[in-house]
Amino acid sequence: MRQTADRLRRWRPGAIAVVILCAGLGFVAYEKFLARDISIYPDDEQNFKYGSIGNDGATGVPYAIWIVLPKVFPEYLPGPGGYASLGFRWEPGRTQSDAPLGFSRARVGVERMAINCAFCHVTTFRRALGAQLEFAAAGPGNTVDVLGYQNFLTACARDSRFSGDGLLPAMEQEVHLSWLDRLIYRYAIIPFLKKSLLRQAEQFKWTGQHERPPWGPGRIDPFNPVKFGMLRLADDGTIGNSDMLAVWNLGARDEVRADAPLHWDGLNTSVREVVLSSALGDGMTAQEYDKQTQASLRRVATFLRRTKPPASPYRPDPAAVNRGHVLYVKLCAQCHAVTGARTLTVIPVEEVQTDRHRIDMWTPAARDAYNHYRTGYDWNFSHFQKVEGYVARTLDGLWLLAPYLHNGSVPTLADLLEAPQGRPKAFVRGGEVLDSSRGGFVAPPCDPAHPEKGAFCFDTTLPGNANFGHVYGTDLTAADKADLLAYLLTL
C-alpha cells in the first residue's frame, strides 16, 4: 500500500502537468478555431450591409489571408484595383482594408470575411461620369461579379504559392501575428483553407459545363448551386443565370396581393423562407444558426419589408410625362400598377415570350426537395412552388433596375421599347454611370469575340441570355415611345 501511495505521489505532479497542458491546448484550439464573436449593428441597414448571416465559420475566409490575396495573386483578377476589379465597393469613410459592402467581418476562431445578403443586393450608381458614388441598399447588385470572385479564390488555392511561405510574409505586413499565430496559420489554417477552396471549386465545376455561359457582373445562377449542392440533386444541364433581384419594399406586396410570390421568379411567397433559404444558399449552417444569427436574419427580413427604393432623380418634361402616363395606363398598368388586375401574378412564358431557361431550371424535384429540406435542423419550409412563367412585378425603383428583363439582357428602357431584333446584341455589363436619356446604365456595345480587357461583354446569343419577348410598346411611334420613356424614368 505504501509503495502504491509513493507511486501516486510521484505521478501526481506529472499528471497535473498533463492535465494543465491538455487544458491549455484545448483553450488555444477553441480560441483559434471555434470561439465565435459577431458584430452587432444597432441600425438595421448597417446590419443588412455588414451583419453576419451565420456562414462565417463554414465559408468565411480568414481576414489575414483574404486581405493579401489580391497582392499575392493579382494576375488572377480581371484588372487592377484589387477586389474593386470584381465589383466590390466600399462606402465613404471605409478603405480597402475594411469590409466592403456585402461582407461580414466576424470572428470564428480568427477573424473571417464572409458574404451576406448585401453582396448581391446593393446597387451602386453615379449620376454622371466622375460624380460621387451612391448606394441603394436592397437594390440589385449591378457591379459585383459573384462567379468571378469564386474563380479568383479557386485560382489562388491552386497556386503553389498558397502556402505558409507564399502568404505569411504578405500577411505580416497587414496584421500583427504572434509566433503562435504564425505556427497555426502555417500548419493548420492555410492548408485547411486551401483544401476547402479546392473542394468548393469541385462543387462549382458545373458552371463551366453544358454550354453554360459565364454569369458576369450583376448576374447569378442562384438556385442551381443549391440544387446540385445542398439538395444533392443531379446536374440536369439547366441554366438559371439571371439578373440580381431588387429585394426592397417587400411589405408592399401585402397591399397588392397578400399571397403573391415575392419576386419575379415566383419561387416563394414567404419573406421568412426567402431570407432563411438565401442564408442557407450562402453557406449558413445549422451549427451557426444560433440566437444571434436568428436575430440578425429577422432584422434583415424587417429591413426588406420596410426599406424603399430611392426616388428617381430624373425630371423629364412634365407634358411628356403626362402623355406617357396615359400610354402607361393603357399598355402597362394591368400588369405593373399597384391596382393592376394581373400585378404580382404569374404571366405564362408563352405569353410574355422571354427566355425560358430560368423557368426550366426550377424543377418540381427541386421544389419538393427544398420544401422537405431538414438537414441539421427543422427549417419548416413549405412555400416553395413551381410556376410556368414570370411574375409581373410593380415598377418601384425601375430607374435603378437595369439591365432589364429577368436575365438582364436589355441594357436600357429605351432598348426595351424596341422590337427584339432592334435591341443590342452585345453590350458591356457592370456599369454604374446612369444613362439619363435612355434609362439604365451606360452600356456601350461590344464584340464578344474581342472583349475589352477588364470589361464583361454580354452576348445575347448564348443560351439563357436571349433578349427577345416582352414586346409591349414596341409598336408605338417614336414620339409615343419618347413620352412613355419620360414617364418610366420617373418610377
Per-range role (PLM):
Residues 6-491:
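Periplasmic c-type cytochrome electron-transfer domains
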Residues 1-4:
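Short, Lys/Arg-rich, polar N-terminal cytosolic tail immediately upstream
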